[in-house]
């Protein structure tokens, strides 16, 4: 291995290991995240509005601050939040047995407090769940009591009281919240979120690969230490290929999607030469690398089932946003540090207006659906065809219509896609075979994911119901997929990447882009860059602040003496101005003050030697002047 690659990998791995920890942050990280006075953030309130669903349910920091407000101000509100948290934990519990039964018992105890006089008196003679009817509580308790004896308790038994608790919290408690310092602090975080982003926000590390318009490298946020992947789109290369609309489309779709199974966009900014997308860093490599370099011959069905389930969830989240992916293949499925997978590279994705079918020959040869190859109109079914190709390849170790590195013309591959029936070996179980056949049906109307579907975007439900995902198979080790837990990221992956490995080509093996000649950027391009350069993306940025403990460390409300911090006090601006007026002098102020003291001291020394300052001798004044000049000269030397 070349020395350049060893150094690049060592530095990158060291940064990766420190990512999110204090040693990964800049020494000046708190300066990057200084809160302004809350009055400067009032425009954020007008811009974002005040709906409960936005502030508490969609904004991670908003939810934490609302819960903090409830805990600090009202026991009833706090109990409501605790109830919601326990129900959410119950519904996504890792264990369908004893752990879930224990949680159900704890939730029942909370609901039973309506008849508990001791608890009632501790909350101003009103129990926390007084807004729930006796019928709702008794029905829920009865169902939960029976569930505590079930081997696998139902996950939805608390859905009705949960819904009613939400309705309660969004009324009076939330109205009180937006009048407090906790909401002002939320606005301060939103203000920080809106600040401009540039190249100085990040440290850059080794190149990981190439995109269509530039390099992809690892980067680290200076303020938080969190690691990301930086995808560069060279401005001149984008313009030369007339790809402005394509680039902006990818950025806007990434910004719109918030799914744990699709790479997230955290920042978008520009430099002099490039448009930059800062994305989720996936350290585990792509499925193509694992399939052909580490596991030639294919994966076992248990591993295939896990990857296929997470990919299905990722496509479901895209389809619910009316986004068609159109480029499913092994190299576009990336593994994270723990072995979970995400869909990447949304350059060919498109938003379907009113779910209307579209037309266009895009994709990768061998993975494009027959209707794309035949240049017909298509909809979400082409993505389910891609899932079929991917599952087949993961099991068989090769694509269904083309051998790896096979020398074959594009026309021949497209003929196979249109006409040939894929062949199945003994590697496929019966469930895997029927799943692939259903997904690889030539006619979209008969394809799995496109049949018996009320809405076109609901095809994932049909696939999730297939026996491959919902039945156990002792021969392959396959078990039913716990979809709720999988969506919460609580299912342990069957494979975990080595944290000390770099799943990327050597630095010197990644080809560099040639210089683009004959392209000049003008004012029209600047207008386009303004649409692209939008800075932080809200939810990923807030999650970053929480994960790296920046939120916990900065979210203080009181000084050591118990007084409110200046940026939350109504007179805080005046306080800060007064503080700055009497603050520690700057360098030059301290320097000249020191020299003045030296001059005064020299005069005092002369006085001690018997020099009459009332009637100075001819030598006294020159001595003082010489001392002053020496001080000035010394000052000039110090400044240089």
Swiss-Prot record:
Q: RGS domain location, by residue?
A: 52-187
Question: Which Gene Ontology cellular component terms are annotated?
Answer: cytoplasm
Organism this protein belongs to: Caenorhabditis briggsae
Q: Which GO terms describe its molecular function?
A: ATP binding; G protein-coupled receptor kinase activity; protein kinase activity
Statement: the UniProt record of this protein carries the keyword Protein biosynthesis: no
Q: Which reaction does it catalyse?
A: [G-protein-coupled receptor] + ATP = [G-protein-coupled receptor]-phosphate + ADP + H(+)
The name this protein carries in UniProt is: G protein-coupled receptor kinase 1
Catalytic residues identified in the record: 327
